[in-house]
Amino acid sequence: MSAPKANDAGFLTQELTILNKSGIHARPAAMFVKTANRFTGDIFVEKDGEKINGKSIMGLMMLAAGPGSKVTVLAKGSDADAAIAELEALVNRKFDED
């Protein structure tokens, strides 16, 4: 795990690899959104140049992030560090699937 980096727009960013066997389908998307919604700041997820609201189940599913996909989580706000840490932990533990 590397430390999040700040981009020019003031967002903390962290690249993550999707590790679970099925990628981000409905259940992992719901878990991601439930976690993201605990934070007050803005959270986005980017894959292959497409950026979606990280608090949207449909948006996450539309990214079609399969196993091994690289996604970037962007967070901004007073709790951005904590948001990225918790979302990274969720992804790294394979959404509790495997």
Regions found by a protein language model. Name each.
Residues S2-A3, T17, V73-L74:
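Intrinsic disorder
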Residues S2-A6, A30, K34, A82-E86:
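Long, contiguous binding/interaction regions
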Residues S2-A9, F95-D98:
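Short, charged, intrinsically disordered terminal tails
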Residues A9-N20:
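Short amphipathic
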Residues A26, A30-S78:
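Amphipathic, hydrophobic secondary-structure cores in small proteins
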Residues G66-D98:
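C-terminal structural segments of small proteins and small subunits
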